[in-house]
Regions:
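Extended HEAT/HEAT-like alpha-solenoid repeat tracts in very large eukaryotic scaffold/adaptor proteins
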Residues: 39-40, 113-120, 124
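Short, intrinsically disordered, charge-balanced linker/junction segments flanking boundaries
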Residues: 142-152, 159-165
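Conserved ankyrin/ankyrin-like repeat signature
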Residues: 15, 54-55, 116-120, 152-153
Length: 165
């Protein structure tokens, strides 16, 4: 199983597909102690979190648990439903200009990455992911999405404050 997570982290879609063809039950595999950053998380969570959305899409098509939430551990006391991970990723990957240290602006994320993140999130919603689930701090999907927008909307509003009426 650790090998599956390593292949996932490398973004090896074909290797993951082959594993699922041989062992369909692996679709809901949960990471063990290593790597620590993935401890207790599902393949789908790790695929979304690491930005391997083509693999996330495959896992969803193969029946991954859309309502999974990991158990708290000493290393990772914060637990989040996979739908919150997907919602946060969809906002995080949205196209926007970001200001770099040198004052120059550049586009963050590509149109393709943004569209893919949104597609995965929307697919999960359409397939019935439970949007009422709460994370270990009591936060909801809506709160997660709003928190993620802090990177997108406030800077845009502040940079355009001259547009007051």
């Amino acid at each position: 199983m650790q090998k599956t997570f390593q292949l996932l982290r490398r973004g090896d879609l074909e290797a993951i597909r082959q594993i699922l063809d041989k062992k369909p039950e692996e679709v809901n595999a949960v990471s063990g102690d290593k790597p620590k950053r993935d401890q207790g998380q599902s393949l789908l969570q790790v695929a979304i979190k690491s930005g391997h959305l083509d693999i996330a899409d495959l896992l969803i098509d193969r029946g991954a648990d859309l309502n999974f939430i990991e158990e708290p551990t000493e290393l990772n006391p914060f637990c989040q439903p996979v739908i919150q991970t997907a919602g946060g990723r969809a906002v995080f990957d949205c196209r926007r200009m970001i200001k770099r240290w040198n004052g120059q602006y550049e586009m963050y994320s590509s149109k393709e990455k943004s569209d893919q993140s949104f597609k995965v999130f929307k697919k999960m919603l359409e397939l019935g992911a439970d949007i009422s689930q709460k994370d270990s701090h009591g936060g909801t999907l809506l709160q997660t999405v709003l928190i993620e927008t802090k990177e997108v909307l406030p800077s845009l509003l502040l940079e355009n404050k001259r547009n007051k009426r």
